[in-house]
UniProtKB/Swiss-Prot annotation:
Species name: Mus musculus
Modified residues (Phosphoserine): S116
Stored Gene3D superfamilies: 1.20.1170.10
UniProt keyword annotation of Hydrolase present: no
Post-translational note: Highly phosphorylated during mitosis. Phosphorylation is barely detectable during interphase.
Segments forming a coiled coil: 215-629
Cellular component terms per the entry's GO annotation: cis-Golgi network; Golgi apparatus; Golgi cisterna; Golgi membrane
Composition bias type Low complexity, residue spans: 148-167
Keyword Iron: no
Biased composition (Basic and acidic residues): 134-146
Gene for this chain: Golga5
Regions that span the bilayer: 697-717
Modified residues (N-acetylserine): S2
Assembly and oligomerization: Homodimer. Interacts with RAB1A that has been activated by GTP-binding. Interacts with isoform CASP of CUX1.
Protein name, UniProt field: Golgin subfamily A member 5
Length: 729
């Protein structure tokens, strides 16, 4: 903020100089009012004076004020008093001329007297010494000692009063054209001056008596000097008006600068808030990536569990082979005697009960798994709602940031408009300065040309005035150069501000674009999660229906086996009680062996089907766990195995349970045996297909591709980091 402090210091210096110039102008005007008493003797010159006042009053504003500012830099205290008393003095200017205007002019009865050379010398001495007096009063006592009082003093006093009224009337006209002027200090002192101005007519009487021939030329020179002094007075008044307007304008610019500073600070605070919000959003994105990594670790754990399940399946297949060997041994024992058949049937019943118990346990575990799956679904729903709330909050923040950017753009437009207006004012100021300089140069040339016709004393006075005018011209040029430098500095600072605002707007646009991209990604992930949830719900319903169907089929088959076991028991009891012949016994034995073979095949098919159902239940459990633990993994439950298993069961039903009580011997038994062997082969093929389904291959390929994509995204994506601090800090 060093540039702002420098600018404030320069503005303060400029205001001090303006006040000093106004004070000195007022002081000069008070001292020069005494010597304008003889303007009434020359009405043509007075009319020309007023005309030139209106013509040159607006042109000599800026340059004369700058010269007076530089010439009198040490009168700040008097400037303060002059600025405070503006209102009361302007009222005096408006009322006092009307009082004097009501009095009749006695200039028509007054006979103009000629002054002597000592009086002219006193006048020049007074003009040279009037700039050093602090109060603007003329020491007229010296003139009283030199010039005796004549009887014509009342007429002189009246002429002085009329000249003062005409001068003040001209000043009042200038004040009405530009209100707010600070140069009206001469009004309260007019009532004190008639006693002092009485010395001027006495001096004029001596001049008329001493040198009547030289008086006409001297009076012409004095009238020219009065005209020039009146022009300078008018210029001083117009310059004071301009200084007042410049003071007001500087105050307004200071207020605008304070407002702009407050706006910049507010914008910096808003920018820091937006940076904090972006950091929070990035932290949320990092949390989501960590959650994805956790899901990947859970998938790896599920893979390990799948391998363990495969190992358990292999152990169960080994147990199945052991059971098959045991079954073959039981069959051999059953051939040895009918007593062993009852024992084998009992063991089969026990195994069926064990199978029922295992089925119940599996059902209970399935229910527990279902409850866990429902809890996880509820948790996913809660997470989805939280994500939706976060998305809405991000959209709201985006709209707020967009509004702030629009407001900043409007402020930039306003600053540009103010810059254009300042440039236009500077151009106008340059044009006015050039016109004033041209008018001054013309005046200097005219004074040079007229100096050859004047006397020695008038040439010295005009040369002094020329030197002063040249000095004023040089000082005004220096002031213009200073103002140009300040203008260039302000223009560069404004360009820097515009560049900074443009860069900040671009950064805000980039941040908004990043937020929009993040919101779009979150929306897509939300839609994917919703679709995955719906698919998992459908698969869960399919699984429930499938388990219900398998339960019903197993219960019906268990009832059928119990009925067959009861029939076998009845046959065994009937065998002991019957007294049939040997042929009947042989035929019955043959039928029993065939039925035993059929029952064995049925038991084998049931055991294989039971194993397949157990494997299917385990696979469904794994799929449900994987779906609940990793909803984004995109795993799908394959229902082809269930359909194939159901088709196999439907195909086994007519073969195994059709006409079990009639025509067990003969060709029918052979055909039935062949059908059972074919059915057994088809069941084994189904088990092989269940162990190696094509859906599992697709699932494995999909999981591998998903993990590969996640790793590529995590390794290649690099979030944008802002290392710079916010502007508010």
């Amino acid at each position: 903020m060093s540039w702002f402090a420098d600018l404030a210091g320069r503005a303060e210096d400029l205001l001090n100089r303006v006040d000093q110039g106004a004070a000195t102008a007022l002081r000069k005007e008070n001292t020069s009012n005494i010597f304008y008493s003889k303007n009434t003797d020359y009405p043509e010159l007075q009319q020309q004076n007023t005309d030139s006042n209106y013509q040159t009053g607006q042109k000599a504003n800026y340059i004369s004020s700058a010269a007076d500012n530089i010439r009198h830099q040490k009168a700040t205290i008097l400037a303060g008093t002059a600025n405070v008393k503006v209102g009361s003095r302007t009222v005096g200017d408006a009322t006092h001329p009307t009082e004097h205007a009501s009095a009749p002019r006695p200039s028509s009865q007054f006979v103009r007297r000629k002054k002597s050379e000592p009086d002219d010398e006193l006048l020049f001495d007074f003009l040279n010494s009037s700039q050093k007096e602090p109060t603007g009063r003329v020491e007229v006592k010296k003139e009283k000692g030199r010039a005796p009082v004549s009887p014509s003093s009342p007429s002189g006093v009246s002429s002085v009063n009329t000249s003062v009224t005409t001068t003040k009337a001209m000043g009042g006209n200038a004040g009405s054209q530009s209100p707010g002027v600070n140069s009206s200090d001469s009004v309260p002192e007019v009532h004190k001056e008639p006693s002092e101005e009485s010395t001027a007519p006495s001096a004029t009487s001596e001049e008329h008596s001493s040198t009547p021939s030289d008086g006409s030329s001297r009076s012409q020179e004095l009238s020219n000097l009065r005209l020039e002094n009146q022009l300078l007075r008018n210029e001083v008044q117009s310059l004071n008006q301009e200084m007042a307007s410049l003071l007001q304008r500087s105050k307004e610019t200071q207020e605008e600068l304070n407002k702009a500073r407050v706006r910049v600070e507010k914008w910096n605070v808003d920018n820091s808030k937006s940076d904090r919000i972006t950091r929070e959003l990035r932290a949320q994105v990092d949390d989501l990536t960590e959650a994805v990594a956790a899901k990947d670790s859970q998938l790896a754990v599920l893979k390990v569990r799948l391998q363990e399940a495969d190992q358990v399946l292999s152990s169960r297949t080994e147990a199945l082979e052991a059971l098959r060997s045991e079954k073959s041994r039981i069959m051999q024992d059953h051939k040895e005697g009918s007593s062993l058949q009852n024992q084998a049937l009992q063991t089969l019943q026990e195994r069926l009960h064990e199978a029922d118990a295992t089925l119940k346990r599996e059902q209970e575990s399935y229910k527990q798994m279902q409850s866990e799956f429902a809890a996880r679904l509820n948790k996913m729903e809660v997470d989805r709602q939280n994500l939706a709330e976060a998305v809405t909050l991000a959209e709201r923040k985006y709209s707020e940031e967009k509004k702030k950017v629009d407001e900043l753009q409007q402020q930039v437009k306003l600053h540009r408009a103010s810059l254009e207006s300042a440039k236009q004012e500077l151009v106008d100021y340059k044009q006015k300065a050039t016109r004033i300089l041209q008018s001054k140069e013309k005046l200097i040339n005219s004074l040079k040309e007229g100096s050859s016709f004047e006397g020695l004393e008038s040439s010295t006075a005009s040369s002094m005035e020329l030197e002063e005018l040249r000095h004023e011209k040089e000082m005004q040029k220096e002031e213009i150069q200073k103002l140009m430098g300040q203008m260039h500095q302000l223009r560069s600072e404004l360009q820097d501000m515009e560049a900074q605002q443009v860069s900040e707007a671009e950064s805000a646009r980039e941040q908004l674009q990043d937020l929009q991209d993040q919101i779009a990604k979150q929306r897509t992930s939300k839609q994917e999660l919703e679709t995955e949830l719906e698919r998992m719900k459908q698969e869960f319903r399919y699984m429930e229906e499938d388990l219900h169907r398998t339960k019903n089929t197993l219960q019906s088959r268990i009832k059928d086996r119990e009925e067959e076991i009861q029939k076998l028991r009845n046959q065994l009891t009937n065998k002991t009680l019957s007294n049939s012949s040997q042929s009947e016994l042989e035929s019955r034995l043959h039928q029993l062996t065939e039925t035993l073979i059929q029952k064995q095949t049925m038991l084998e098919s049931l055991s294989t089907e039971k194993n397949s159902l157990v494997f299917q239940l385990e696979r469904l459990e794994q799929q449900v766990h994987s779906a609940s633990s990793g909803p984004n993994s995109g795993s799908a439950i394959n229902m082809s195995g269930v359909d194939s298993g159901e088709g196999t069961r439907l195909r086994n039903v007519p073969v195994l349970f059709n006409d079990t009580e009639t025509n067990l011997a003969g060709m029918y038994g052979k055909v039935r045996k062949a059908a059972s062997s074919i059915d057994q082969f088809s069941i084994r093929l189904g088990i092989f297909l269940r162990r190696y389904p094509i859906a599992r291959v697709f699932v494995i390929i999909y999981m591998a591709l998903l993990h590969l994509w996640v790793m590529i995204v995590l390794l290649t994506y690099s979030p944008e980091m802002h290392h710079d601090q916010p502007y508010g800090k």
